[in-house]
């Protein structure tokens, strides 16, 4: 029986993993085995939030070396990660400058400057990408406006997965789905926008032409001497997660739920109308020529930070306690900039509630309940926005990723959005990474065939919406909070 062994390196903003997938091609039976899981934490050094790229590389190699020591010869290796962040290299392939994180505060206020100079409408028409203060466009504006001798040394700019491609193979490539998150890619031409680069002062030579998922990057020399193929997958983890979401129709929306919540639809055409701009909808690159028409939501980052700050170890007990509390007592707008990276998340939540005349959540369970209720309401808002944009309602929400394990939040989403919710698979980005490799190898015919295979190999859990009494009043409260003009004066900017 023919077998394909595939390695997926899946790097998230808080953790990473090296996974081994085995596909028995005759039966289409797919299994996953976790080889190595590791944390990915921000490092605050030289007054900036940075990624520890050396630690990530060590962990990637730890997983790959373990597979090699097992005597397994992978047919391919693929890497995906979060978007917008980049690495600069000199002519010799050595890193230049700091590996900044998108949560670093050096971009505070930069987006306002750029949009004032270029115009939001003009930028959106060119790129179709939502306005987030940490987009690569604004990171590079901050970099180039504070010039140093380092800039003269730069020869290459690589997104995070492409940097690790380079470290494994020595090949310099730029994969399309991650490049699309930069807000520097032409929506129409799917290549770099020269006018935006000129505005920044970024030389075109820094950037390779984007390649599509499935591109053969090169070979990794394993300790055993084996030469293992490295394939460019949909290297933006959300793009891979969408591949790994077994959507049942074009009337289904996906929600990749983790540190970030990314909700959207799969579309053959982008949406960059004034209505889409007003909703801050993004059109990121997908596989097979599709667009990921979606919206970024702050996601479980809020809960992760609260748990970290308050040393909460038993997440299950916290969720159970939160579920027992009255619903919608205290609400926040999770996408308020103050929640991007405050010194204290629980204090930022309390301050927000106090400023908006709401009960202040004090206990751990009250904080968690506030986060869950607010996220569910924001999910409803985006579901409605997507339906209006496509002139057809969203009829089902498919939740994938780590957050899909939260049964309480899944049911809350179904109740608040008033549509059925399907949850799973948990490792959607890993599976999408694997799917891209299997399609490149010809082991799976196409995206539809891969998703069909997923439904037969990984269980899905269905949540049916229940009627919520007095919901209309809570919804009006949240809608008022989500309007920018309701933010107290001087409180919109990210907390320093």
UniProtKB/Swiss-Prot annotation:
Keyword Transferase set for record: yes
Catalyzed reaction equations: L-rhamnulose + ATP = L-rhamnulose 1-phosphate + ADP + H(+)
Keywords on record: ATP-binding, Disulfide bond, Kinase, Magnesium, Nucleotide-binding, Rhamnose metabolism, Transferase
One annotated Gene Ontology cellular component of this protein: cytosol
InterPro entries: ATPase_NBD, Carb_kinase_FGGY, FGGY_C, FGGY_N, Rhamnulokinase
Coiled coil feature spans: none
Catalytic center residues: 237 (proton acceptor)
Residues annotated as binding ATP: 13-17, 259, 304, 402
Annotated disulfide bonds: 353-370, 413-417
E.C. number(s) listed in UniProt: 2.7.1.5
Co-factor(s): Mg(2+)
Cross-referenced Gene3D superfamilies: 3.30.420.40
Short name of any one Pfam family annotated for the protein: FGGY_N
UniProt-annotated binding residues for substrate: 83, 236-238, 296
Described purpose of this protein according to its UniProt entry: Involved in the catabolism of L-rhamnose (6-deoxy-L-mannose). Catalyzes the transfer of the gamma-phosphate group from ATP to the 1-hydroxyl group of L-rhamnulose to yield L-rhamnulose 1-phosphate.
Protein name: Rhamnulokinase
Native source species: Pectobacterium carotovorum subsp. carotovorum (strain PC1)
Organism lineage: Bacteria, Pseudomonadati, Pseudomonadota, Gammaproteobacteria, Enterobacterales
Gene this chain is encoded by: rhaB
């Amino acid at each position: 029986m023919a077998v394909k062994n595939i390695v997926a390196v899946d790097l998230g903003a808080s953790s990473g993993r090296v996974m081994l997938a085995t596909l028995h091609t005759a039966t289409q039976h797919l299994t996953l085995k976790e080889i190595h899981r590791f944390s990915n934490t921000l490092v605050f050094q030289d007054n900036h939030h940075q990624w520890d790229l050396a630690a990530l590389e060590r962990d990637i190699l730890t997983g790959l070396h373990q597979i090699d020591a097992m005597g397994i010869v992978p047919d391919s290796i693929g890497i995906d990660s979060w978007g917008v962040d980049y690495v600069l290299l000199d002519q010799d392939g050595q890193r230049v400058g700091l590996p900044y994180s998108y949560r670093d505060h050096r971009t505070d206020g930069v987006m306002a400057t750029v949009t004032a100079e270029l115009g939001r409408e003009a930028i959106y028409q060119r790129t179709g990408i939502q306005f987030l203060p940490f987009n690569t466009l604004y990171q590079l504006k901050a970099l180039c406006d504070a010039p140093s001798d380092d800039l003269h040394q730069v020869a290459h700019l690589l997104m995070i997965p492409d940097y690790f491609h380079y470290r494994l193979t020595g090949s310099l490539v730029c994969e399309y789905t991650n490049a699309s998150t930069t807000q520097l890619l032409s929506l129409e031409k799917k290549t770099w926008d020269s006018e935006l680069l000129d505005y920044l002062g970024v030389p075109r030579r820094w950037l390779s032409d984007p390649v599509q998922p499935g591109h053969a990057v090169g070979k990794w020399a394993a300790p055993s001497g084996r030469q293992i193929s490295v394939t460019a997958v949909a290297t933006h983890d959300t793009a891979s997660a969408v591949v790994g979401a077994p959507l049942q129709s074009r009337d289904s929306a996906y929600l990749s739920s983790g540190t970030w919540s990314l909700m959207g639809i799969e579309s053959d055409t982008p949406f960059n109308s004034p209505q889409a701009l007003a909703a801050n909808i993004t059109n990121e690159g997908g596989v097979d020529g599709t667009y990921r028409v979606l919206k970024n939501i702050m996601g479980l980052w809020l809960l992760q930070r609260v748990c970290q700050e308050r040393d909460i170890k038993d997440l299950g007990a916290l969720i159970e306690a939160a579920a027992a509390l009255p619903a919608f007592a205290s609400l926040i707008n999770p996408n308020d900039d103050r929640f991007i990276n405050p010194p204290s998340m629980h204090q930022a939540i309390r301050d927000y509630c106090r400023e908006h005349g709401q009960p202040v959540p004090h206990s751990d369970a009250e904080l968690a309940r506030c986060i869950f209720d607010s996220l569910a309401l924001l999910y409803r808002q985006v579901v409605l926005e997507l339906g209006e944009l496509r002139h057809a309602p969203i009829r089902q929400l498919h939740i994938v990723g780590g957050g899909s394990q939260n049964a309480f939040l899944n049911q809350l989403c179904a109740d608040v959005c008033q549509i059925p919710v399907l949850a799973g698979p948990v490792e959607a980005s890993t599976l999408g990474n694997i799917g891209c490799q299997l399609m490149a190898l010809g082991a799976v015919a196409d995206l539809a065939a891969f998703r069909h295979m997923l439904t037969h190999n990984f269980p899905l859990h269905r949540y049916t919406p229940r009627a919520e009494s007095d919901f209309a009043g809570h919804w009006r409260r949240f809608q008022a909070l989500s309007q920018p003009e309701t933010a107290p004066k001087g409180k919109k900017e990210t907390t320093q």
